[in-house]
Design a protein with these regions (language model features):
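Conserved alpha/beta-hydrolase "acid-adjacent" motif
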Residues: 181-187
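Primarily recognizes the serine-hydrolase "nucleophile elbow" in alpha/beta-hydrolase
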Residues: 69, 114-115, 121-168
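Histidine-bearing beta->alpha loop at or near hydrolase active sites
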Residues: 92, 207-214
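A domain-start/cap signature at the N-terminus of enzymes
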Residues: 17-55, 100, 107, 126-138, ...
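Short beta-strand/loop motif that positions the catalytic acidic residue
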Residues: 174-176, 180
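Serine-hydrolase catalytic machinery in alpha/beta-hydrolase-like enzymes
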Residues: 25-46, 50-121
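Bacterial N-terminal signal peptides
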Residues: 6-14
């Protein structure tokens, strides 16, 4: 692809199952772009062997790690038979392209697919804060790879040119508190409006009295997020877009 992408996101911030499901969160790593990358994986016992399961990639907030979201999703994932994975960003204070994605996220998902029976048309993104922003960008870069995205407390910059990269209008839901000091309603509504103008169907939920703290309301947010995500899947097998980040 001949796009010249000079985007550095410095943010606020298997045919049969070869690995057994477990009720333990496992910390593991892969090598991606010649770098060792850590992640936290939870494949609950409720995931039936040989039955394709959905996968949610959880992108943590700035200053945290993948475990911070996996811990909050674990019980719900067990109830709904969802495999979840929380990768660590290279720099804990931010997510950035190209070091953290899309290639790293693609490598991570494909690695999990090689060990578990994942439904390739039901691979989703969920992000909080800095991770929410990154999830929105990944939805644009890899619109034919990720089926749908939920962002909690995140927004794009106004009139973001990367919106034009999307070959598919990824279903997106955004949750934001009416008292979030980092993401004012005006900014989040602007993201919704910019995406809507380009043909995206964006669901925006403004949570009355809620601030930026996802962790205190995680069970409610997670359930609402899954209610949105599970309605969507790719209409055909995923296609991964390769970018030349050096031009």
């Amino acid at each position: 692809m001949r796009y010249s992408i000079l985007l550095l996101l410095a943010l606020i911030l298997v045919p049969s199952q070869t690995a057994a499901a477990s009720d333990k969160v496992v910390k593991d790593s892969i090598t991606s772009q010649n770098k060792k990358r850590s992640f936290y994986l939870y494949a609950p016992d409720s995931v039936k062997s040989g039955t394709p399961a959905p996968l949610i990639v959880l992108l943590h907030g700035s200053g945290h790690n993948g475990l911070s979201l996996v811990d909050k999703w674990k019980d719900f994932a067990a109830k709904e038979a969802i495999i979840i994975v929380g990768p660590d960003s290279m720099d804990p204070s931010r997510w950035a392209s190209p070091v953290d994605g899309p290639d790293f996220l693609h490598d991570l998902v494909e690695s999990i697919k090689s060990k578990y029976t994942i439904d390739p048309r039901r691979v989703y993104l969920f992000g909080h804060s800095g991770g929410a922003i990154f999830a929105l960008y990944m939805s644009l870069f890899e619109s034919q790879y990720f089926a749908a995205t939920v962002a909690h407390a995140g927004a794009l910059r106004r009139r973001e040119p990367a919106i034009g990269l999307a070959k598919r209008k990824t279903p997106i839901a955004i949750f934001v508190g009416t008292r979030d000091p980092l993401f004012p309603l005006e900014d989040v509504r602007g993201t919704r409006d910019d995406l809507n103008k380009q043909g995206f169907a964006v669901e925006l939920t403004e949570v009355p009295g809620h601030d930026h703290n996802y962790y205190g309301v995680a069970p409610k947010i997670n359930q609402s997020a899954w209610e949105f995500l599970k309605k969507h899947q790719l209409n055909e097998d995923p296609q991964y877009e390769q970018y030349n980040w050096n031009k």
